[in-house]
Curated annotation (Swiss-Prot):
<keyword id="KW-0963">Cytoplasm</keyword>
<comment type="similarity">
    <text>Belongs to the RuvA family.</text>
</comment>
<feature type="region of interest" description="Domain I">
    <location>
        <begin position="1"/>
        <end position="71"/>
    </location>
</feature>
<dbReference type="InterPro" id="IPR013849">
    <property type="entry name" value="DNA_helicase_Holl-junc_RuvA_I"/>
</dbReference>
<dbReference type="GO" id="GO:0000400">
    <property type="term" value="F:four-way junction DNA binding"/>
</dbReference>
<comment type="subunit">
    <text>Homotetramer. Forms an RuvA(8)-RuvB(12)-Holliday junction (HJ) complex. HJ DNA is sandwiched between 2 RuvA tetramers; dsDNA enters through RuvA and exits via RuvB. An RuvB hexamer assembles on each DNA strand where it exits the tetramer. Each RuvB hexamer is contacted by two RuvA subunits (via domain III) on 2 adjacent RuvB subunits; this complex drives branch migration. In the full resolvosome a probable DNA-RuvA(4)-RuvB(12)-RuvC(2) complex forms which resolves the HJ.</text>
</comment>
<dbReference type="InterPro" id="IPR010994">
    <property type="entry name" value="RuvA_2-like"/>
</dbReference>
<keyword id="KW-0238">DNA-binding</keyword>
<dbReference type="Pfam" id="PF14520">
    <property type="entry name" value="HHH_5"/>
</dbReference>
<keyword id="KW-0234">DNA repair</keyword>
<dbReference type="GO" id="GO:0006310">
    <property type="term" value="P:DNA recombination"/>
</dbReference>
<dbReference type="GO" id="GO:0048476">
    <property type="term" value="C:Holliday junction resolvase complex"/>
</dbReference>
<dbReference type="InterPro" id="IPR000085">
    <property type="entry name" value="RuvA"/>
</dbReference>
<dbReference type="InterPro" id="IPR012340">
    <property type="entry name" value="NA-bd_OB-fold"/>
</dbReference>
<feature type="region of interest" description="Domain II">
    <location>
        <begin position="72"/>
        <end position="150"/>
    </location>
</feature>
<keyword id="KW-0233">DNA recombination</keyword>
<dbReference type="GO" id="GO:0005737">
    <property type="term" value="C:cytoplasm"/>
</dbReference>
Length: 225
């Protein structure tokens, strides 16, 4: 089994929306499917075509051997975890990593964002539900780590500001904004509170409400485009 390779680029091409490289490693040519982002960097000479190192997932089939190359071990391991899910093939795995970073996928799993997962070609509603369910158990520690990080980053200790945020949530709910939408913009508002608090002597509820509605309406208009 091939698990890692280092060599020089001989050729690169795309076919059927798949990206490939041919790597010369000690006189042998290895055809490897790679992520589109890495392909574009090679094509536009953003990175050297010499001494390319790829972490390889080697898949053996009856009639062929398939090599998938990744620029980091984390990408390779994430790809392997995706392939362990029933009904998910290699091209779905590549499609997910072509579209999102690992942290973006983990965040989508944490928030159960089926719409985001379904935006990957080949993934339907049922598969997105299965992916979220199974990956949530596989990446439990990563999800908990992200939640703790988020909690530490946005923890508020000032009782007056806590009360202001609670009032803001209730007011936005009374204005028919959904809880999911409100929770999405709260971290932004909390950052703004910190910024405004340093810049101005006092914070006004009216100013925060106006700011929150601006972000919510902007987010809504972007989704409608």
């Amino acid at each position: 089994m091939i698990s890692w390779i280092n060599g020089d680029l001989v050729d690169l091409w795309q076919t059927n929306q798949k990206s490939f490289v041919l790597i010369n490693c000690q006189g042998l040519g290895y055809e490897i499917q790679i992520l589109e982002s890495f392909f574009l960097k090679l094509k536009t000479n953003q990175i050297s075509t010499k001494n390319i190192t790829l972490w390889i997932k080697h898949i053996k089939k009856e009639d062929s051997d398939l090599l998938f190359g990744f620029t980091s071990k984390d990408q390779k391991n994430f790809f392997i975890e995706i392939l362990s899910i029933r009904g998910v093939g290699s091209q779905i795995g590549i499609g997910i990593l072509n579209k999102f970073s690992i942290s973006e996928v983990i965040n989508a799993i944490k928030t159960q964002d089926k719409k985001l997962i379904c935006s990957v070609p080949g993934i339907g509603q049922k598969m997105s539900e299965r992916l979220i369910l199974e990956l949530k158990s596989k990446f439990k520690s990563e999800i908990l780590s992200e939640e703790e990080k988020s909690k530490d980053e946005f923890e508020i200790k000032d009782p007056e500001i806590i009360k202001m945020i609670e009032d803001l949530q209730l007011t936005l709910q009374s204005l028919s904004y959904k809880n999911k939408e409100i929770n999405t913009i709260l971290p932004i508002i909390i950052k703004e509170i910190d910024h405004l608090g340093k810049k101005e002597n006092s914070l006004s509820f009216e100013k925060l409400l106006k700011l929150a509605m601006h972000y919510l309406d902007e987010d809504s208009s972007n989704k409608d485009r």
